[in-house]
Structure formats: C-alpha cells, structure tokens
Amino acid sequence: MIQVQTILNVADNSGARLVMCIKVLGGSRRRYANIGDIIKVAIKEAIPRGKVKKGEVVKAVVVRTKKGIRRTDGSMICFDNNSCVIVHDTTNQPIGTRIFGPVTRELRVEKFMKIISLAPEVL
C-alpha cells in the first residue's frame, strides 16, 4: 500500500537506491498503489555512474509491499520492505538489466513479462 511520500527501495541495477513516491498513476483521486501498479517517483539516493541520477523524476512499478497481496486461494504474500523497479516513461520496460529479490505472479497479469523473466524468483 504505497501512497505519496512513501520511501521505497529499488530492486534493479539502474543506479538508484532509494526513491520517493510523488504520484500514484491511474486516476485523479487514486490514493494507494499495490503490487503491479505504476507510480511516479523521485530519485532520493543513487550510486555514481548509474543510469539515473539523484533528483530525476521517473516511472516505477511496485514489485514488493509490506502490506502484501491476497490470492484467490486465501493465501497472503507479504514482504519485509517496499520495493519498485524503475521503467521507461513510454514503453514501461525496465531500465536496469537485473532484478534483485523475489517478485509475485501478479505482475504477469499487468503485462510486465520482462520483469518476471529477469527476476531470480517468482512467488
């Protein structure tokens, strides 16, 4: 459950380490984002010589949340942190070439097959 001002970890090798949500995309009054939703983020902390710089505003896909997600079989998947993957503004393809940590199957429904194929584990 990500809202404006939430700090997230970055789960790829784009060069960003921490980002802050500045907008939840998908409706003028939409307040929260869950796994698989696209958000607008500002880069708060980045490594030198990365693909993105501190202060840039980019799009990101939420891949892990502490609140988790409920499946139709009744199971619940929760994570230890809130994480996202930075994507291109137009194509919604990931900027990085590697994904760190597990992602959920719910990304498949949202058409993020590239993120699923790069992830080391799909829950």
Curated annotation (Swiss-Prot):
This is Large ribosomal subunit protein uL14. Part of the 50S ribosomal subunit. Forms a cluster with proteins L3 and L19. In the 70S ribosome, L14 and L19 interact and together make contacts with the 16S rRNA in bridges B5 and B8. The keyword RNA-binding applies. Disulfide bonds: none annotated. Pfam families: Ribosomal_L14. GO terms for molecular function: large ribosomal subunit rRNA binding; structural constituent of ribosome. Belongs to the universal ribosomal protein uL14 family. It comes from the Bacteria. InterPro entries: Ribosomal_uL14, Ribosomal_uL14_bac-type, Ribosomal_uL14_CS, Ribosomal_uL14_sf. It comes from Buchnera aphidicola subsp. Cinara cedri (strain Cc).
